[in-house]
Regions:
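Conserved SAM/SAH-binding loop
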Residues: 16-22, 260-267
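Terminal low-complexity, poorly structured segments
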Residues: 3-5, 239, 253, 260-263
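Core catalytic lobe of class I
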Residues: 1-243, 273-276
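Short, flexible loop/turn segments with low-complexity composition
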Residues: 157-161, 255-265
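C-terminal helical cap(s) of enzyme catalytic domains, especially alpha/beta-barrels
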Residues: 241, 245-255
């Protein structure tokens, strides 16, 4: 039985469910997924154990990546924001491992974007101080792995809202912008709206459907509203659903929702829509 949306606002919907169990999304209906799954670094989410054994984490990742693949159209894409690696609880090559699993369940690899978040958490660690005994290496970057289901090239025409300067800068492969403040957003691991905004404008047409299976504070749906995409967010934690709903409502009011949900409502005068 399909659950009712926690929030439905125009073409944006939030579901308070476990993504692995939800039946709210039709197979082969998603054009683009933009998400940052749990990192398994013991972040206190409230309703999810973010410190499980690594093999269990990889199996969990396999399940959700497979389901996401099933929900995606043949020319659909996935932008997967994950850490390059992790050191807490033992060094693990998260980016490499999840990329391998994604390919094993059917995703095809396209590219990797390096996100230089400029050390938002101000992390510092040295391990063995001034000694070769056991020094730590910290990567102050994350990655966005770009994958696709069957066809990288879109099989239909649509309207792109990306500007020329954005296209040139964003296809460079190294993105430099700051991370988001936990305190300001009220979520233990938010990403800035700049991240989904770039993915959405670069990899989807206006009016297409974007999914975030780990919605968190709702940032992906905010970008959907601002850029004229339909958006579906799934979040297991009810308190985070409330937070996401509040942020989405505020964004809807600020961007005049009745215009944004139209196919060209979010385009500025400076942007020239074009078919690709």
């Amino acid at each position: 039985m399909r659950a009712k949306p926690f929030l439905e606002l125009g073409k944006v919907r939030i579901y308070n469910e476990d993504f692995l169990e939800t039946e709210a999304i039709e197979p082969d209906s998603i054009d683009l997924t933009v998400t940052s799954p749990p990192y398994n670094v013991d972040i206190k989410y409230g309703s999810y154990d973010d410190g499980i054994p690594y093999d269990e984490y990889l199996e969990f990742s396999r399940k959700w990546l497979r389901k996401c693949h099933d929900l995606t159209k043949d020319d659909g894409r996935l932008c997967l924001n994950v850490p390059l690696d992790k050191n807490k609880g033992g060094a693990q090559s998260v980016f490499a491992d999840l990329t391998i699993i994604a390919k094993e369940v059917g995703w095809k690899y396209y590219a990797t974007v390096i996100w230089n978040e400029q050390n938002i958490s101000r992390r510092t660690a040295w391990g063995s101080w001034m000694s070769a005994s056991a020094p730590y290496v910290i990567a102050p970057v994350e990655v966005i792995v770009v994958l696709y289901k069957k066809s990288w090239e879109k099989t239909h025409e649509g309207i792109s809202d990306i500007a020329e300067d954005e296209l040139i800068e964003w296809t460079d492969g190294v993105w430099n912008f700051s991370g988001e403040s936990k305190r300001r957003i009220g979520h233990p691991s938010p990403f800035p709206v700049e991240l989904p905004k770039r993915c959405i404008k670069l990899f989807s047409y206006v009016g297409e459907t974007v999914l975030d299976p780990f919605l968190g504070s709702g940032t992906t749906l905010i970008a959907c509203l601002e850029r004229g995409r339909a958006g579906i967010g799934v979040e297991i934690n009810r308190e985070y659903c409330k937070l996401a709903a509040k942020r989405v409502r505020n964004t809807g009011a600020q961007t005049k929702l009745e215009e944004v949900i139209g196919p060209l409502g979010s385009l500025t005068r400076e942007e020239t829509p074009r078919k690709r």
